[in-house]
Amino acid sequence: MFFPEYPAIPLKYGDRGNDVESMQAAMNVILAKYPTHDVLVEDGYFGNETDAAVRRFQQHIGLIEDGVAGRYTWISIFAIANIIYES
């Protein structure tokens, strides 16, 4: 898969861009393992669905559930997505 460098600023609700789209793609790899959750539209917009998915992810792995994709959330998303993708 891929493991892009952390974008140096936390991603949060309302943000747009390639970093958000990359994170959405990685989240979709994870979400595909959990059929009770819908996959995200990979549009590069950090909207309600992306925020909810990030919060669920943070809660599931024991991070602070704030909906912000900071360094630890970013690294965790891509690390887990890569493990799933390569398995």
Regions found by a protein language model. Give the residues of each.
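Short, basic amphipathic alpha-helical segments that act as recognition/interaction helices
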Residues: 74-80
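Terminal recognition/anchoring or ligand-binding modules at protein termini
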Residues: 65, 80-87
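Conserved hydrophobic/aromatic packing and binding residues within compact polymer-binding modules
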Residues: 54
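Acidic, Ser/Thr/Pro/Gly-enriched interdomain connector segments
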Residues: 1-44, 84-87
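Short helices/loops that flank or line small-molecule/ion binding pockets
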Residues: 58
